Amino acid sequence: MNTSQDTIYAQPNEHISDFQFDNRVAGVFSDMIRRSVPGYTQIINTIGDFADRFVMPNTQIYDLGCSLGAATLSIRRQIQGRQCRIIAVDNSESMVARCQENLNAYVSDTDVDLVCGDIRDIDIQNASLVVLNFTLQFLPPEDRETLIAKIYQGLNPGGMLVLSEKIRFDDAPIQTLLEEQHLDFKRANGYSELEISQKRSALENVMKPDTLTTHQQRLTRQGFSHFSLWFQCFNFASMVAIK
């Protein structure tokens, strides 16, 4: 995968546009997410492990908001010979183009349908695994419940949803503490105060995190009977829900 260094916000900008997954971001995304999201590599690797346990032969896997294909590749490595199909979806043409290059670099007997489109429009059926890896937070809050409902309906009994998100906390001191810890993580990974500030401004209107309670209640309302937080580092978390 592309390892170009993320310097998008390294120079002062008079006007900070809303963050978007354009060609600039796609070109540095691997570096950006590694330096911005604590535990990202572990999450990706564990998604593959979950796939090994939960993906059943002749079913479908959905990677909704696949970006450069890290989760799809992790899954595909673990499910050889199961006659499954992965549907990987992203609404950024730049991300999809680079994802296709990454997929082409590895030989596999598992087909991947790479779709450039809105995850809200995807028909989900015969699914044993659905992945939302830092994707739901970018949807308008009013659209999240509908998507979770669609995922639940499309999952086979015993199927799994992996949901990774940046989270917020109603407890103000905890929110401040873990937000500051995350900023220290970014500083330790080489981001300047200017870069941190400008990216925060760019994300302000496009990424709206939920609390863990909100996530769990939404999943329960839509029918998921088993839920667990399996990973958390500061204000980043990954959850599993089983139908």
Swiss-Prot record:
EC number of the protein: 2.1.3.-
CDD domains linked to this entry: AdoMet_MTases
Any single biological process term in GO: tRNA wobble uridine modification
GO MF assignments: carboxyl- or carbamoyltransferase activity; S-adenosyl-L-methionine binding
Presence of the UniProt keyword S-adenosyl-L-methionine in the record: yes
Catalytic function, reaction form: prephenate + S-adenosyl-L-methionine = carboxy-S-adenosyl-L-methionine + 3-phenylpyruvate + H2O
Source organism, top-level taxon: Bacteria
Residues where S-adenosyl-L-methionine binds: Y40, G65, C66, S67, D90, N91, D118, I119, N133, R200
Keywords carried by this UniProt record: S-adenosyl-L-methionine, Transferase
Top-level EC class: transferase
One Pfam family cited in the UniProt record for this chain: Methyltransf_25
Family: Belongs to the class I-like SAM-binding methyltransferase superfamily. Cx-SAM synthase family.
Assembly and oligomerization: Homodimer.
Function noted in UniProt: Catalyzes the conversion of S-adenosyl-L-methionine (SAM) to carboxy-S-adenosyl-L-methionine (Cx-SAM).
Protein name as annotated: Carboxy-S-adenosyl-L-methionine synthase
Source organism of this protein record: Shewanella sp. (strain W3-18-1)
Name of the gene: cmoA
